[in-house]
Curated annotation (Swiss-Prot):
Record protein name field: Protein UL24
UniProt keyword terms in alphabetical order: Host cytoplasm, Host Golgi apparatus, Host nucleus, Virion
Species of provenance: Human herpesvirus 1 (strain 17)
GO cellular component, one term: host cell Golgi apparatus
Location, primary (coarse class): virion
Amino acid sequence: MAARTRSLVERRRVLMAGVRSHTRFYKALAEEVREFHATKICGTLLTLLSGSLQGRSVFEATRVTLICEVDLGPRRPDCICVFEFANDKTLGGVCVIIELKTCKYISSGDTASKREQRATGMKQLRHSLKLLQSLAPPGDKIVYLCPVLVFVAQRTLRVSRVTRLVPQKVSGNITAVVRMLQSLSTYTVPIEPRTQRARRRRGGAARGSASRPKRSHSGARDPPESAARQLPPADQTPTSTEGGGVLKRIAALFCVPVATKTKPRAASE
């Protein structure tokens, strides 16, 4: 009984690790799609998927859409990345059907577990391909359905193996295909808005600068206010005798006595 309980716990732990790896993969790929639209920079995962674009360049795509956990009824492919080619006269787009398999160690070679995963993944992809062929909305342009099996490491998401099945060609409307797949999606990747990320970075920088003492441009610390406000002692306050000294010298020439003018000292409390 105890051994059976441990086995169930271990299976659940492995399953949850795989689920976490899947969601992290979706997030990483969605981030690359967003950056591609904003900057036309193609990330690692998009570059990998571009090998299924039937000779087209990823930079020819007018739009890239990632749709996760598509419910096709009997099957639910992990994600489908759709590349639209609106400027092409014959090609409407390419749907890359991705089945993801995770492994704890990618350096362990071709183990029995990986062979089983590969056989299962290929079967799942063929099933998903048939379902999509029957569900694709009709149209007058070519749409390629390209199944891809991807092995990644659970922690690093490093891709260790990619297997591409023979693509299938159908006549369809790629815009309608995207709408259909989005309506069947059961998982949406939570993407943090750019403004929120920038606001958090600015807040962290402000908190860091507030904790450090302010320095002047010369690199020295600002003098304390008490030192700036110090006044000389009362007994060292000079008397104003500038005018008296000049008059004394003039009066000495004519032998006329002149009184010295001094300012009264402030009375100390």
